[in-house]
A protein has these predicted regions:
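Active-site lid/adjacent beta-loop-alpha segment flanking the redox-cofactor pocket in flavoenzymes
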Residues: 258-340, 344-346
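Extreme N-terminal leader/targeting segments of oxidoreductases
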Residues: 1-15, 33-34, 38
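Glycine-rich FAD pyrophosphate-binding loop
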Residues: 32-55
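Flavin (FAD/FMN) cofactor-binding and adjacent substrate-gating region
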Residues: 66-72, 96-179, 187
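Central helical "cap/lid" subdomain
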Residues: 210-260
């Protein structure tokens, strides 16, 4: 039961954004930046963002060379280049909005490991890929460098080469989301957590967003609604082609004299690791168990964790003493290709979801485009 005051002051908004991850909060911020007097509400089902925005490894990246070679065959050159440019634009928007200090951005470079048992055929396309990307970046993006294998302390018997991207970096995911939350609040955006949106109803005048909590159920009202729930979107729109993909992540104890510095990936990006100070954060392995990892359930997959630990001990930090301090999971959203799903569902409802594991890079750009849709008739 709502009071008179709640009905009068706390239920009605100009815009409601469902989902308080990178895309959702950024969408609310863009709308507020462009329309300062707008009354905006963000609803989040968890006490913290539910999907991957606070659970990712903190890669400020555009994707590895092998990923791009694969994606070129999957979607063609025009779509690939647009996607890469959008990732780059998104990273610059995120850094500009929050500042590098607030997100602890470090431009330590990105590295793709080419393992001994892998074909290095994509390295043969390095020059041609650089040619394709030069109009966007005004420089060569990739170069091969075998010398860094020993410099980082890797097992050189397991790795035949590395491809370097000096444009990439890393962030502190927790600081970034904290800064984004604080920035949104400073603009006057209202954020309610623990509000599980169950139903969205629309008529010709407004949209009702039904949110449930352990205490009550409330129908919030807005002129327009933005859906930014990524892997959890099919709960509201079951017909959409959005498939969840769970990511397993672990973090080591502090390691003395750790040489690893930067962001790293291998096996077409299915495995990824980085240093955080003198620790290693390592995630991935979804391709070991696609079926089991196609879920929105936050559970550890022991098969994948065991493989991560094996790569750590045998290849990444083979001569170090450490323990695994923590494991966790994040839920991403994937589709038939690498393209995000950005569309109007009606005149009053639009969505920006399915970021294919690239939310840090794409979230701020998708937010700009989603805000364009939300404000198009205003």
């Amino acid at each position: 039961m709502l009071s008179f005051w709640e009905q009068k002051e706390l239920i009605h908004y100009d815009y409601i954004v469902v989902g308080s991850g990178i895309t959702g909060l950024s969408t609310a911020c863009v709308i507020k930046e462009r329309k300062p007097n707008a009354h905006i509400l963000v609803l989040e089902r968890g006490l913290l963002p539910t999907g991957a925005s606070t659970k990712n490894a903190g890669f400020a990246c555009i994707g590895s060379l092998s990923e791009k070679v694969y994606d070129l065959a999957l979607m063609g050159e025009d779509k690939l280049l647009q996607l890469i440019e959008n990732r780059w634009i998104g990273l610059q928007l995120l850094r500009k909005r929050l500042g590098d200090t607030a997100i602890d951005f470090q431009n330590n470079g990105g590295y793709e490991l080419i393992l001994n048992h892998e074909s290095n055929s994509h390295v043969e396309q390095l020059s041609s890929m650089n040619d394709r990307l030069r109009p966007i970046f005004k420089q060569d993006v990739f170069k091969e460098d075998k010398n860094k294998i020993n410099a980082f302390g890797f097992n050189a018997n397991k790795i035949q080469s590395m491809v370097v991207n000096s444009l990439e970096g890393q962030i502190n995911t927790g600081k970034m989301m904290n800064a984004l939350h604080q920035y949104a609040s400073s603009l006057g955006i209202k954020i309610i957590t623990g509000a599980d949106v169950s139903v969205i109803e629309e008529n010709d005048k407004y949209v009702l967003v039904h949110a449930n909590s352990s205490y009550n159920n409330i129908a919030f009202k807005a002129s327009k609604v933005a859906i930014c729930t990524n892997a959890f979107t099919r709960k509201l729109f079951p017909h959409l082609e959005i498939n969840p993909g769970r990511g397993q992540v672990l973090v080591t104890s502090p390691i003395s004299d750790l040489k690893v510095k930067g962001i790293f990936s291998f096996d077409e990006g299915f495995y990824y690791f980085r240093n955080f100070e003198n620790r290693i954060i390592f995630g991935g392995g979804r391709n070991l168990d696609f079926e089991k990892e196609a879920t929105t359930s936050f559970e550890t997959n022991e098969k994948i964790i065991a493989q991560l630990q094996q790569y750590l001990s045998e290849m990444i930090i083979p001569n170090y003493s450490y323990t695994i301090e923590q494991t966790w999971t994040g839920i991403m959203a994937f589709g038939p290709n690498k393209l995000p799903l950005l569309q109007s569902m009606s005149d009053r409802i639009a969505m920006g979801v399915r970021l294919n594991g690239m939310g840090v890079a794409l979230g701020s750009k998708i937010a700009e485009d989603l805000a364009d849709i939300m404000l198009s008739d205003d």
